[in-house]
């Protein structure tokens, strides 16, 4: 009889992730052995850790506020564990990944349908803010001394 168990493991630290993977494999092997079974453990790495460079994040915060308006920029607190292919770029050069809030007016973002779900319904009126944020980031970056 074959059974499969799958899940997602996201951490803010690569060494911590590697340690958790080793510990998970050992725990799974021990549980299987305790029941007279065997286990095949494998990891499929879909995307690397998305890590925002602290100095670049600090530099970018006022630029985003300039683009979005005072009081409209919310730092990710607590940090989020997004898994994006953008992280591969961040492995080569410093980068910042940010979200453009698109929850409908009057809807609580904490209870709104998440991205990539059938109920996701973005307020498209925020798209110009996203364009402005990208353009202002490029302009301000080129204006740096």
Predicted regions and their residues:
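Metal-dependent amide/peptide-bond hydrolase catalytic core
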Residues: 2-145
């Amino acid at each position: 009889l074959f059974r499969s168990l799958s899940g997602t493991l996201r951490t803010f630290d690569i060494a911590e992730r590697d340690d958790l993977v080793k510990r998970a494999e050992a725990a799974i092997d021990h549980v299987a052995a305790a029941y007279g079974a065997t286990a095949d453990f494998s990891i499929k790495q879909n995307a690397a850790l998305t890590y925002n460079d602290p100095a670049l994040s600090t530099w970018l915060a006022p630029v985003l506020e300039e683009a979005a308006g005072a009081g409209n920029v919310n730092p990710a607190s607590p940090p989020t564990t997004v898994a994006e292919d953008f992280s591969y770029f961040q492995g080569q050069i410093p980068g910042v990944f940010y979200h453009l809030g698109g929850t409908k007016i009057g809807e609580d973002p904490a209870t709104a349908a998440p991205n990539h779900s059938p109920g996701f319904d973005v307020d498209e009126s925020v798209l110009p803010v996203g364009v402005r944020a990208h353009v202002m980031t490029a302009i301000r970056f080129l204006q740096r001394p």
